[in-house]
Design a protein with these regions (language model features):
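Short Lys/Arg-enriched alpha/beta "domain-start" segment
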Residues: 1-59, 63-65, 80
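Surface-facing alpha-helical segments and adjacent helix-coil boundary elements at the starts of domains
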Residues: 43-105
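Amphipathic alpha-helical scaffolding segments comprising HEAT/armadillo-like alpha-solenoid repeats
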Residues: 94-106, 128-149, 172-183
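HEAT-repeat alpha-solenoid elements in large eukaryotic scaffold proteins
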Residues: 108-125
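Hydrophobic core positions within HEAT/HEAT-like alpha-solenoid repeats
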Residues: 116-120, 161-163, 194
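Structural signature of alpha-helical solenoid repeat scaffolds
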Residues: 120-127, 166-167, 198
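Eukaryotic acidic, Ser/Thr-rich intrinsically disordered low-complexity regions
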Residues: 179-204
């Protein structure tokens, strides 16, 4: 996974379902951003386009496995990162991790397909942090979202949650706790939780 170059500040957003990559590329060209790198999608890989903006590195990635497109902006200056991210948001519809957490914490609960997409989105948003082992600041909303989703009555939601926790717990420690607490409980995804608990036992 390519994550661009050295950074002091970083912001990540996902593109909305109907965002047009061509519009983003046109906006980048219009702002004079220099195309920095591109990789061709292959099996299990991501298609990526990168630009060098004024004081910032902008990386667009299509995370095919998770069904999301991500833009990560890094730079030494918080202002430069904010400016480049603002240009992205002006060009195309975006979704932030805050938006995804809102879906997972909604009352009444969101539809299962929306919850699964939100869980996959959180995985995509943290994909570089997971690759680099870069721990993230504590955010209690993540644990609250896990607590909510692990008790969902639909198996596919719990499976998506367990897969997300498996990715994220290295950079957001403690997310596995609500899952492991249900290892002996009956439920539609008991086997999924048992398998995850066994993985944690082996890893620990």
């Amino acid at each position: 996974v390519s994550d661009g170059q050295g950074e002091g500040h970083e912001r990540t957003v996902l593109l909305g379902k109907h965002a047009d990559r061509a519009v983003l590329e046109s906006a980048a060209a219009g702002r004079g951003w220099r195309r920095a790198a591109i990789s061709t999608a292959g099996h299990g890989e991501m298609e990526q386009v990168a630009w060098q903006a004024a004081g910032a590195f902008v990386l667009y990635s299509e995370v095919h496995l998770l069904g999301h497109r991500v833009v990560r902006v890094t730079g030494e200056s918080e202002a430069a990162v904010a400016e480049a991210l603002g240009a992205v948001r002006d060009a195309v519809p975006t979704v932030s991790p805050d938006d995804l957490l809102d879906v997972l914490l909604a009352m009444p609960p969101a539809e299962s397909t929306q919850m699964i997409r939100a869980l996959n989105g959180l995985r995509a948003a943290d994909i570089w942090n997971c690759a680099n082992g870069r721990r993230q600041p504590a955010d209690p909303r993540y644990a609250d979202a896990v607590e909510r989703a692990v008790r969902h009555p639909e198996r596919q939601v719990v499976r998506a949650l367990v897969e997300a926790v498996g990715d994220l717990m290295a950079v957001r420690p403690g997310l596995e706790v609500p899952v492991l607490a249900l290892r002996d409980a009956d439920g539609p995804a008991r086997d999924v939780i048992e398998d995850f608990a066994g993985f944690c036992d082996a890893a620990g």
